[in-house]
């Protein structure tokens, strides 16, 4: 009976030592810096960096260049789309 208890204690001790060594290696790999970890950057863009024509139109809607007359093809248009001096409209 004493041999069985001693054998069981040795088996438990072996499992504990093995578990401690696995835990130590896991902690070491977590604290070590992974190669290229700091260099990884992600940039996501959903459109043109200068903006889109829709954004420009939304920002300038209702404005009219003082130099430009109303558009002859569309009298209800508040801006002149053909004027070369007009900076309100994207070309």
UniProtKB/Swiss-Prot annotation:
Tagged with keyword Cell division: no
Residue ranges, annotated region (Disordered): 22-48
Family: Belongs to the alpha-defensin family.
PANTHER family: ALPHA-DEFENSIN 1, ALPHA-DEFENSIN 1-RELATED
Highest classification ranks of the organism: Eukaryota, Metazoa, Chordata, Craniata, Vertebrata
Pfam families: Defensin_propep (PF00879)
This protein's record includes keyword Secreted: yes
Swiss-Prot/TrEMBL GO biological process terms: defense response to bacterium; disruption of plasma membrane integrity in another organism
Protein name according to UniProt: Alpha-defensin-related sequence 2
Region (7 X 3 AA tandem repeats of C-P-X): 65-85
GO CC terms, sorted: extracellular space; secretory granule
TM ranges: none
Per-repeat ranges for Sequence: 65-67, 68-70, 71-73, 74-76, 77-79, 80-82, 83-85
Tissue-specific expression: Small bowel, spleen, colon, kidney, liver, stomach and femur marrow.
Major localization class: secreted
Residues of the propeptide: 20-58
Role: Apparent precursor of a secreted, cationic, proline- and cysteine-rich peptide that contains Cys-Pro-Xaa repeats. Unlike cryptdin, the proposed mature peptide region lacks the structural motif characteristic of defensins. It may have microbicidal activities.
Biased composition regions of type Basic and acidic residues, renumbered to the chain: 27-40
Location relative to the cell: Secreted
Keywords attached to this entry: Antimicrobial, Defensin, Repeat, Secreted, Signal
Signal peptide limits: 1-19
Record-linked InterPro entries: Alpha-defensin (IPR016327), Alpha-defensin_N (IPR002366)
